[in-house]
Amino acid sequence: MQERHTEQDYRALLIADTPIIDVRAPIEFEQGAMPAAINLPLMNNDERVAVGTCYKQQGSDAALALGHKLVAGEIRQQRMYAWRAACLQNPQGILCCARGGQRSHIVQSWLHAAGIDYPLVEGGYKALRQTTIQATIELAQKPIVLIGGCTGCGKTLLVQQQPNGVDLEGLARHRGSAFGRTLQPQLSQASFENLLAAEMLKTDARQNLRLWVLEDESRMIGSNHLPECLRERMTQAAIAVVEDPFEIRLERLNEEYFLRMHHDFTHAYGDEQGWQEYCEYLHHGLSAIKRRLGLQRYNELAARLDAALTTQLATGSTDGHLAWLVPLLKEYYDPMYRYQLEKKAEKVVFRGEWAEVAEWVKAR
């Protein structure tokens, strides 16, 4: 069985989205995992704690014996069934544990005894994690063009349409604002960084690119923060600003935050609960900026939001949301973005409407 253990092997695994059967405990997987990994643990969280305690108190031999005792009989059969099914479903995959140690070797040996030869990652998750960190540091050194613009200018779509674009908000599963949450929970910080590195590696491998196209983001995207090496490079990057008419921005925001989010919530939860989730999502977003709006203005906009939701529920029309969205943009989001942009005005190299910026970026 050929093991993969060179830096190039690790990068090739990430670029190819090689399926990884990660046999670490669920708590370890939740703290950080590779994008193409599935968690089929050798030991669950409680079993891992018990074996770890035994190791500290009685040594490695006793801990190994306890592990075999805990994962035996029907439990072992159930886990073997899951590993075997995963191996057959993913014949090009690999096994992975924390450091390429006993857990992945034990599972590998059990599979071998069952007639399945399956490689493992030498160095385990730790080695892959070091690869993603180093890859991000290296790839972030390439030139960057940032796409800026006020809320609703279609910055994310523009980035998505570039062959050398990386959608940071899509990877973070958050759109970066108070209303930015999606129906997908955000990943742990380590998993987000691993996903970002894998996406950068794949994009670079496809394009052999000269520069990155990214959205002009702050350090935080929801609960995830950008790797410092990338964030530092972004502060030095040229900025192309999308300046679309206000009416076009409103159309985009209506589609993205009202029509699409309502559809997504009802699709996920059903009509009744989905409507409640959608209402809570909008109220939570507005409440998140209550302090900055001031209590009186917040209460006024919250009342308009309630009225808009009542109309939407009764008629299906989202037009009523303009009564609170327009002042929110003009009084809060637009002034805030313009203030931020003024502080980096010397970085702005191009301004234009969406199609003009897209054409300018394409020519870089």
From Swiss-Prot:
S-S pairs:
none
Rhodanese domain residues: 14-137
Q: What is its EC number?
A: 2.9.1.3
Where are the catalytic residues?
97
The processes (GO biological process) annotated in the record are: tRNA wobble uridine modification
Gene3D superfamilies in the cross-refs: Rhodanese-like domain
Mind telling me which InterPro entries this protein's record contains?
Rhodanese-like_dom, Rhodanese-like_dom_sf, SelU
Which keywords belong to this entry?
A: Selenium, Transferase
Q: What sort of enzyme, by top EC class, is this?
A: transferase
Biological function: Involved in the post-transcriptional modification of the uridine at the wobble position (U34) of tRNA(Lys), tRNA(Glu) and tRNA(Gln). Catalyzes the conversion of 2-thiouridine (S2U-RNA) to 2-selenouridine (Se2U-RNA). Acts in a two-step process involving geranylation of 2-thiouridine (S2U) to S-geranyl-2-thiouridine (geS2U) and subsequent selenation of the latter derivative to 2-selenouridine (Se2U) in the tRNA chain.
Extract the HAMAP family matched here.
tRNA_sel_U_synth
Q: Which family does it belong to?
A: Belongs to the SelU family.
According to the record's subunit comment, the protein's assembly and interactions are:
Monomer.
Q: What is this protein called?
A: tRNA 2-selenouridine synthase
Q: Tell me the name of the encoding gene.
A: selU
